[in-house]
Amino acid sequence: MIGRIVGTLIEKTPPELMVDVNGIGYEVSASMTTIYDLPQIGGQVTLFTHLLVKEDSHTLYGFIDKNERALFRVLIKVNGIGPKMALAILSSMSSEELITNVQESDVTALTRIPGVGKKTAERLIIELRDKLGQAAKTDLFSAPAVLRQVQADPRQEAEAALISLGYKPQEAAKAIAGVPVDAANSEDVIKAALKGMLRK
């Protein structure tokens, strides 16, 4: 899995980009939210990526921060929402706006997104409400400025990892709380938390 690319932006034809990484040009699909934040051609870019593999294609999707990528991954799990529609949604509103609209069951706001009718909006609300609520608790959808920091909080990263492994948010939080504060990084925190849960 390609999780991140760092290189020179050599083409920008929304929604497609090309990034040169050590002489190799990566074709990347991106939302307008990401594209608006990119430098001019020739500038250095860092994109968090999601590789979608199908029988007849390999498509790389790029995002300006982990926040947007996490939301993309949630969206493409919704019945009837493919990657193109997910990018359209991310291009139309911020992650914070989407979370708010889903939690408030605001069908009208969601139908303003191109290609999203009433039935699709209702399905988004039903299928996303719990998923987005859990994601918000892991701080995946916190302020972009925080998400772009190079050094993330290892305990938050570890808690998010445990939830992605299938543990409930409450279980993950309790397990992390029992880890000694001298754990150096998220990997150490995860290992210690898992050992603690296995002892119970």
From Swiss-Prot:
GO molecular-function term, one example from the UniProt record: four-way junction helicase activity
Region feature Flexible linker, mapped onto this chain: 144-149
Signal peptide: none
Function comment: The RuvA-RuvB-RuvC complex processes Holliday junction (HJ) DNA during genetic recombination and DNA repair, while the RuvA-RuvB complex plays an important role in the rescue of blocked DNA replication forks via replication fork reversal (RFR). RuvA specifically binds to HJ cruciform DNA, conferring on it an open structure. The RuvB hexamer acts as an ATP-dependent pump, pulling dsDNA into and through the RuvAB complex. HJ branch migration allows RuvC to scan DNA until it finds its consensus sequence, where it cleaves and resolves the cruciform DNA.
Keywords, alphabetical: Cytoplasm, DNA damage, DNA recombination, DNA repair, DNA-binding
Known partners and oligomeric status: Homotetramer. Forms an RuvA(8)-RuvB(12)-Holliday junction (HJ) complex. HJ DNA is sandwiched between 2 RuvA tetramers; dsDNA enters through RuvA and exits via RuvB. An RuvB hexamer assembles on each DNA strand where it exits the tetramer. Each RuvB hexamer is contacted by two RuvA subunits (via domain III) on 2 adjacent RuvB subunits; this complex drives branch migration. In the full resolvosome a probable DNA-RuvA(4)-RuvB(12)-RuvC(2) complex forms which resolves the HJ.
Domain of life assignment: Bacteria
Domain notes: Has three domains with a flexible linker between the domains II and III and assumes an 'L' shape. Domain III is highly mobile and contacts RuvB.
One Pfam family matching this protein: HHH_5
Chain positions covered by the region annotation Domain II: 65-143
Disulfide bonds: none
One example of a Gene Ontology biological process annotation: DNA repair
GO cellular component: cytoplasm; Holliday junction helicase complex; Holliday junction resolvase complex
Subcellular location: Cytoplasm
Region (Domain III): 150-200
Protein name: Holliday junction branch migration complex subunit RuvA
Taxonomic placement: Bacteria, Pseudomonadati, Pseudomonadota, Gammaproteobacteria, Oceanospirillales
SUPFAM superfamilies: DNA helicase RuvA subunit, C-terminal domain, Nucleic acid-binding proteins, RuvA domain 2-like
Family: Belongs to the RuvA family.
Region (Domain I): 1-64
Keyword Cytoplasm: yes
